[in-house]
């Protein structure tokens, strides 16, 4: 009876963890989608460590939700095969999350390097491409910055007029405020340092969250293994 009572407690805790996994899965998907939207607005393009991280987060979130569903079915029916499958796949998810967390830490400086290269490349296209101009203007206005390293970077763009910066560099944005500008009226700090630092910080936050979720998943694996052992022993946990 004591064993059966203990296993009922384990089963209840497993249900609680499964609900937590579902919540974490939804959270991961939301964070991944949000990060992807942010990166799409900061012109980080191509299959780079920075741009692939949101995709990995979304994939892990979807997979975690499916695995939690399998675990719920296995716990309800006390099905040995389903619980084994749940434990194995949860272990795989945990390994992916730990790997993603490590990758996020290792490539935190790479994210800034990618952003710097892309930002300078797109500055060249600013006068030629309205879509690029719109993205750069939004970034400069939102982060209160101007140019890559500083506002003088705009002077190096051949197609830009002399003594001119985009209007989005102005402290108080008005039409034509960037023409023959006064240095006191524009943001002097570069966008690479401001936005790149923000990106690195958020990569580390996501990495820390992944490690936290992985710790909870360890508990899920332990409880699942306990339930599997109980099922094999023939105890009634209902």
From Swiss-Prot:
MF terms in GO: protein-containing complex binding
Entry membrane topology: Multi-pass membrane protein
Localization in the cell: Cell membrane; Lysosome membrane; Late endosome membrane; Endosome, Multivesicular body
Keyword DNA repair: no
GO CC terms in record: azurophil granule membrane; cell surface; endosome lumen; endosome membrane; extracellular exosome; extracellular space; intracellular membrane-bounded organelle; late endosome membrane
Cytoplasmic side stretches: 2-11, 73-81, 225-238
Transmembrane regions: 12-32, 52-72, 82-102, 204-224
Expression tissues: Detected in platelets (at protein level). Dysplastic nevi, radial growth phase primary melanomas, hematopoietic cells, tissue macrophages.
Residues bearing attached sugar chains per UniProt: 130, 150, 172
Major localization class: membrane
Motif stretch (Lysosomal targeting motif): 234-238
Any one GO biological process: positive regulation of integrin-mediated signaling pathway
SUPFAM superfamilies per the UniProt record, alphabetical: Tetraspanin
Extracellular membrane side: 33-51, 103-203
Modification note: Palmitoylated at a low, basal level in unstimulated platelets. The level of palmitoylation increases when platelets are activated by thrombin (in vitro).
A Pfam family hit: Tetraspanin
Assigned keywords, A-Z: Cell membrane, Endosome, Glycoprotein, Lipoprotein, Lysosome, Membrane, Palmitate, Protein transport, Secreted, Transmembrane, Transmembrane helix, Transport
Function description: Functions as a cell surface receptor for TIMP1 and plays a role in the activation of cellular signaling cascades. Plays a role in the activation of ITGB1 and integrin signaling, leading to the activation of AKT, FAK/PTK2 and MAP kinases. Promotes cell survival, reorganization of the actin cytoskeleton, cell adhesion, spreading and migration, via its role in the activation of AKT and FAK/PTK2. Plays a role in VEGFA signaling via its role in regulating the internalization of KDR/VEGFR2.
Assembly with partners or alone: Interacts with TIMP1 and ITGB1 and recruits TIMP1 to ITGB1. Interacts with CD9. Identified in a complex with CD9 and ITGB3. Interacts with PMEL. Interacts with KDR/VEGFR2; identified in a complex with ITGB1 and KDR/VEGFR2 and is required to recruit KDR to ITGB1 complexes. Interacts with SYT7.
Additional remarks: Lack of expression of CD63 in platelets has been observed in a patient with Hermansky-Pudlak syndrome (HPS). Hermansky-Pudlak syndrome (HPS) is a genetically heterogeneous, rare, autosomal recessive disorder characterized by oculocutaneous albinism, bleeding due to platelet storage pool deficiency, and lysosomal storage defects. This syndrome results from defects of diverse cytoplasmic organelles including melanosomes, platelet dense granules and lysosomes. Ceroid storage in the lungs is associated with pulmonary fibrosis, a common cause of premature death in individuals with HPS. This antigen is associated with early stages of melanoma tumor progression.
Family assignment from sequence similarity: Belongs to the tetraspanin (TM4SF) family.
Annotated protein name in UniProt: CD63 antigen
Species: Homo sapiens
């Amino acid at each position: 009876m004591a064993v059966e009572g203990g296993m009922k407690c384990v089963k209840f805790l497993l249900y609680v963890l499964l609900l937590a996994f579902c919540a974490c899965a939804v959270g991961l998907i939301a964070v991944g989608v949000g990060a992807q939207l942010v990166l799409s607005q900061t012109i980080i393009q191509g299959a780079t460590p920075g741009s692939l991280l949101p995709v990995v987060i979304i994939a892990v979130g979807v997979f975690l939700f499916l695995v939690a569903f399998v675990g719920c079915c296995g716990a309800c029916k006390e099905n040995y095969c389903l619980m084994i499958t749940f434990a194995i796949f949860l272990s795989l998810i945990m390994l992916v999350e730990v790997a993603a967390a490590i990758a996020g830490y290792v490539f935190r400086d790479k994210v800034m390097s990618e952003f710097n290269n892309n930002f300078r490349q797109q500055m060249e296209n600013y006068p030629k491409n309205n879509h690029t101009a719109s993205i750069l203007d939004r970034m400069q206005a939102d982060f209160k910055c101007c140019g890559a390293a500083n506002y003088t970077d705009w002077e190096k763009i051949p197609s830009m007029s002399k003594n001119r910066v985009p209007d989005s560099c102005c402290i108080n944005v008005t039409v034509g405020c960037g023409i023959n500008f006064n240095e006191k009226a524009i943001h002097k700090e570069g966008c690479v340092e401001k936005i790149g630092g923000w990106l690195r910080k958020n990569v580390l936050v996501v990495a820390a969250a992944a490690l936290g979720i992985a710790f909870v998943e360890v508990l899920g694996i332990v409880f699942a293994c306990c339930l599997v052992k109980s099922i094999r022993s023939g105890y009634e946990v209902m």
